[in-house]
Amino acid sequence: MKVVAFERQEQGTGASRRLRNAGKTTGIVYGGEAAPQKIELDHNALWHALKKEAFHSSILDLEVAGQSQQVLLRDVQYHPFKQLVLHVDFQRVDAKKKLHTKAPLHFLNAEISPAVKLSSAIVSHVATEIEIECLPADLPEFLEVDLSKIEAGQSLHAKDITLPKGVVLVAHVDAENPVVASATVPAGAVSDAAEGETPAA
């Protein structure tokens, strides 16, 4: 995904306000061997790009002053109540160095799972993303979580996710193995089932 930005000359609160009034958003590019670079971006284009999941989880081609560099979106600052992006941070990517980032989770096949079909359970998505490590070339846009075999009362954990080649969970996630999805039967469904099993007097 390509992002076009411009070098930012002015600095300070007043300059940032003038840029916002002109429909621009301030940003910074850091990391790698180059010095941090202050940039400005078109606010409307950035606002729409931020609605796309891939913008948050993919390697981006950032073009500044005709020079292209590969970056990851690292931080976004929003206005507390206006539909306004105040600032964005991008980190340069080194093709030979592993990234520590978060990958979105896409949950599949809950509707055909035993939990839903046999027990009318509700499958809850406990996590929406998970921390991974990989080289930039191996970075997945998202990770699929197959729920087709989950049963009522069961949970799926981080280590149950099938990871693409070259992708691993970060050390603390691997050690903690947190729950990413769980299947629970609503209290009403349990009591209804119990009543149905009560023998007739």
UniProtKB/Swiss-Prot annotation:
Family annotation (Gene3D superfamilies): Ribosomal protein L25, beta domain, Ribosomal Protein L25, Chain P
MF terms in GO: 5S rRNA binding; structural constituent of ribosome
Alphabetized InterPro entries for the sequence: Rbsml_bL25/Gln-tRNA_synth_N (IPR020056), Ribosomal_bL25/Gln-tRNA_synth (IPR011035), Ribosomal_bL25_b-dom (IPR020057), Ribosomal_bL25_C (IPR037121), Ribosomal_bL25_long (IPR001021), Ribosomal_bL25_short (IPR020055), Ribosomal_L25_dom (IPR029751), Ribosomal_uL5_bac-type (IPR020930)
Entry keyword set: Ribonucleoprotein, Ribosomal protein, RNA-binding, rRNA-binding
Domain of life: Bacteria
Secreted listed as a keyword: no
Cellular component aspect of the GO annotation: cytosolic large ribosomal subunit
Pfam families with a match to the protein in the record: Ribosomal_L25p (PF01386), Ribosomal_TL5_C (PF14693)
GO annotation, biological process: translation
Family: Belongs to the bacterial ribosomal protein bL25 family. CTC subfamily.
PANTHER family on file: RIBOSOMAL PROTEIN L25/GLN-TRNA SYNTHETASE, ANTI-CODON-BINDING DOMAIN-CONTAINING PROTEIN, RIBOSOMAL PROTEIN L25_GLN-TRNA SYNTHETASE, ANTI-CODON-BINDING DOMAIN-CONTAINING PROTEIN
Function: This is one of the proteins that binds to the 5S RNA in the ribosome where it forms part of the central protuberance.
Assembly notes: Part of the 50S ribosomal subunit; part of the 5S rRNA/L5/L18/L25 subcomplex. Contacts the 5S rRNA. Binds to the 5S rRNA independently of L5 and L18.
Name recorded for this polypeptide: Large ribosomal subunit protein bL25
Source species of the chain: Burkholderia lata (strain ATCC 17760 / DSM 23089 / LMG 22485 / NCIMB 9086 / R18194 / 383)
